[in-house]
Every structure is written in structure tokens, then in C-alpha cells.
Regions:
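HIT superfamily nucleotide-processing domains
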Residues: 1-141
Length: 141
């Protein structure tokens, strides 16, 4: 297991590094990555530091995907996307993370398309996504 104190995502969770957070609950945080494949690209992470997706216990695994599903609908609406593409690879940061990427075609989910996030574009988009997520129906237990 990687050192959580050295993990960039753990630093974001702790508030020691800035991030454009669009969703936070007791167990997860979703934010814009520094490089995005398409506008609206989000990264969803569990607050529990775990390196590999399949090392999460069953409850944490299910909660992660339930949170991804709750985010995907409003994100798709805001971005007027046909789909929300999902990618999990885990090599760039040793902390479980799910990429939620608005796409309109298969080729839209291509990491080679990643580019630096433009603050002029990101700030208004951040606000629109946060509002849409806040208006979405709360999770059912």
C-alpha cells in the first residue's frame, strides 16, 4: 500500500491541495482532473486510501459505483452528452479512481486526447455541474 501522506488524492481529501470539487459525501470526492479528456471529465475517488479497485471491500466497491451512477445522470445532462464513459486504470495515482468522461462517440474516451484544464472554461462548468448535482435526488439507503 502506498503512503497515504504521499498520495496526491489523499492530500486533496485532506484539503492540503486545491481541487475543483463538484461532489463530496462521507465516503467519496469527485473533482476535475488537472488534465481532461473532454470538458466535464471528472475523477471520483473513495476517501479511504486504497491502491487497487478490487482491494476495496464489497460495501465500499458497491458504494463507489452507486456514487458514480448518481453523478453520471446530472453530468450527462449538463454536458449534453450521449453517454458518460468510464475508465479505471490506476497507474497515474496509486489511489482508486474512476474517470467519468462525457462522450458522444467511442473514440471520445481516449486518454491521448487529454489536455490541461483551462480555468476560463473550467470555472463556469464547475459551477454548473455542482448545481446540477446538488439538485439531483438524494441517494436512497
Amino acid at each position: 500500500m502506498a503512503d497515504p501522506n504521499a498520495c496526491v488524492f489523499c492530500q486533496i481529501i485532506a484539503g492540503r491541495l486545491p481541487a475543483r470539487i463538484v461532489h463530496e459525501d462521507a465516503d467519496h470526492v469527485a473533482f476535475f482532473p488537472l488534465e481532461h479528456i473532454n470538458p466535464g471529465h471528472l475523477v471520483l475517488i473513495p476517501k479511504q486510501h486504497t491502491d487497487y479497485l478490487f482491494d476495496l471491500d464489497a460495501a465500499a466497491y458497491q458504494a463507489l459505483w452507486a456514487t458514480a451512477a448518481r453523478i453520471a445522470g446530472p453530468l450527462r445532462d449538463v454536458m449534453a452528452a450521449k453517454r458518460i464513459g468510464v475508465a479505471v486504470e490506476g497507474f497515474s495515482v496509486p489511489h482508486v479512481h474512476v474517470h467519468l468522461v462525457p462522450i458522444n462517440a467511442f473514440d471520445d474516451l481516449n486518454p491521448a486526447r487529454a489536455q490541461a484544464l483551462d480555468p476560463a472554461q473550467a470555472d463556469p462548468l464547475h459551477a454548473r455541474i455542482r448545481v446540477a448535482l446538488a439538485r439531483a435526488a438524494p441517494a436512497r439507503d
